[in-house]
């Protein structure tokens, strides 16, 4: 019988009603006991790593999760992390970079309604996550939610209330799960233990700046003492304003100082390409300015934190950013 380590971190799935609103209160053991049948399928060990609202998730807690999985990697056949939905996509992306090419599945799941709610989606999500983690063809980091298995670098929370909370952005779902069956769309890549690569260091000095009409160029100066990289969410396919030269100067001052700028789009689907319009093309050749293609913002945040945790050399940052960490899960961007 396979062994699964279930890591509980809190979130809606573990929450109970209080006078101050929903608050994580159920333990991992209580959550596991709430889903009949899962302990008949495998040996489950529950670890209560934390019990927080995922709004309070931080990079240091990603490191704690990653280090915990690595410490117990040889003792289990798979890992299931119970996590709040609000920052699950960030955590899934971060773990994808901290634990690369894992031959063992690392599955994140949660719910839109607490386990104790009579209409909860928690039981089916946890049950299907265990099923997916037990399957011989499962590997790497995935989000399993509402019958879908989504690559860790492609998940995004798209809905705040409905059970279909997560979508796979700019890449197909890896599998559908229904009636105890897994319908896979990808079967050709199964890494071995020799492929496994693990990391610890992260640099959390990464900021997401969303462009709005008339945004002030001074923002770069204000951020310079606190951050090493900015992710610029541009207009459309990669448009950066040029109503005067202040914004252009601020961007080049930023990257010429050795800092990093990654360009993405505010539009959820189909990605960015700065070379299409004049308002973006002038920035495309600088080694400190990176194009994120169709990566999610959550994945860009995690990837830059991981890269900057390994190096501060601008050329090496560029090389690592465009290096694909998982060939299966990419379309035109180097996840």
Predicted regions and their residues:
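Short Gly/Thr/Asp-enriched flexible loops that form oxyanion-binding sites at enzyme active sites
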Residues: 82-104, 242-249
């Amino acid at each position: 019988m396979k062994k699964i380590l279930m890591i509980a971190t809190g979130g809606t799935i573990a929450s109970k009603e209080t006078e101050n609103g929903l608050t994580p209160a159920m333990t991992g053991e209580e959550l596991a006991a709430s889903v009949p049948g899962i302990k008949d399928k495998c040996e489950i060990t529950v670890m209560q790593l934390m019990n927080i609202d995922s709004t309070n998730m931080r990079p240091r807690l990603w490191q704690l999760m990653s280090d915990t999985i690595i410490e117990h990697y040889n003792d289990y056949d798979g890992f299931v992390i119970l996590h709040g939905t609000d920052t699950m996509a960030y955590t899934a992306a971060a773990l994808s970079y901290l634990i690369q090419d894992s031959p063992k599945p690392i599955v994140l799941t949660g719910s839109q309604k607490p386990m104790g709610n009579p209409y909860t989606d928690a039981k089916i999500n946890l049950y299907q996550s265990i099923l997916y983690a037990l399957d011989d063809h499962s590997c790497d980091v995935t989000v399993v939610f509402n019958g879908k298995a989504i690559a860790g670098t492609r998940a995004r929370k798209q809905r705040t209330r409905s059970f279909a909370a997560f979508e796979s952005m700019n890449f197909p779902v890896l599998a559908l799960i229904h009636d105890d069956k897994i319908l896979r769309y990808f079967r050709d890549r199964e890494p071995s233990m020799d492929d496994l690569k693990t990391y610890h260091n992260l640099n959390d000095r990464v900021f997401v700046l969303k462009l709005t009409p008339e945004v002030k160029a001074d923002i770069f100066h204000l951020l310079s003492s606190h951050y090493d990289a900015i992710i610029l969410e541009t207009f459309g396919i990669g448009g950066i304003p040029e109503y005067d030269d202040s914004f252009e100067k601020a961007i080049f001052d930023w990257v010429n100082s050795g800092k990093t700028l990654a360009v993405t789009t505010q539009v959820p689907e189909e990605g960015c390409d700065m070379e299409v319009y004049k308002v973006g093309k002038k920035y495309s050749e600088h080694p400190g300015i990176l194009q994120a293609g169709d990566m999610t913002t959550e994945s860009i945040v995690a990837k830059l934190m991981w890269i900057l945790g390994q190096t501060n050399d601008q050329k090496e940052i560029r090389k690592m950013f465009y290096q694909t960490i998982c060939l299966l899960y990419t379309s035109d961007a180097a996840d």
